[in-house]
Amino acid sequence: MSFDVYVMRVFGKSRGSWEAGMGVSAGLEVAAGSVASALAAQEGGAMRVELCHGLEGGGLTPSYGMLAVVRERLHIPLYVLIRPRGGDFVFSEEEMEVMCGDVECCVRLGCDGVVLGALDPAGEVDMGMMRVLIAAAGSLGVTFHRAIDVSADPGRTLEDVIALGCERVLTSGGRSSALEGAETIAALVAQAAGRVVVMPGAGVSAGNVLELRVRTGAHEFHASARSVVAARRLGAHPYIHDLGGDYDCTDADKVRQLVRLLSQGAS
């Protein structure tokens, strides 16, 4: 279905009329879990890369070596996920020290921004810890990540994120996918009123990005755009549990498709 037909079906108006109300072009950030994924995102036309490790578990801070190589080879903005472990987003003082060290590495390597978030045991934004991390980032841009999706009150969290001076917030609307959380995302976009970018993420694909754009009013979208890469068969040795199996990598063609769809909906 073309974007024109989709907008007419949902809103009963032409694309031109709808876009006059939107007024801002749309772009794609790609979550990349390897050097190859980051380069595929760039090749496919992504506007920005969020570099991380272990996307299967929600993402962790990438290694220094990966970060250094990607920074050298990437020519589009590079943001880096700062998350020292899986699980919740309530961090200890020692974990804060680790995160500060990782942020400082990003500064030294010339990254464009960091992606982080911290909550207190009550589910509120840990303003003290966030201020320390943001201070360590200096002039780098800051995205508040999906900690908002498990916070006590997403609307209040959004106001705290704005007060901290973050550029954007990544959210699935508190659901397992952005499509399921579209109503909440739309409410956050309306509440933000241009004070911060609200960026839908989680399950964003070519099959739903137009619907998400229309339903949420968002202008930036976050996707991994991955395909399975078949493992090389090394000799006659059988696989041992999960060792040596297939793996995921960002697919430049999937990125191109998303970028093309967003461009159609913004031009």
Swiss-Prot record:
A Pfam family hit: CutC
Chain ranges passing through the membrane: none
InterPro entries named among the record's database cross-references: CutC-like, CutC-like_dom_sf
Presence of the UniProt keyword Translocase in the record: no
Source species, domain of life: Bacteria
Intrachain S-S bonds: none
Cellular localization per UniProt: Cytoplasm
Name of this chain's protein: PF03932 family protein CutC
Lineage, top ranks: Bacteria, Pseudomonadati, Pseudomonadota, Gammaproteobacteria, Lysobacterales
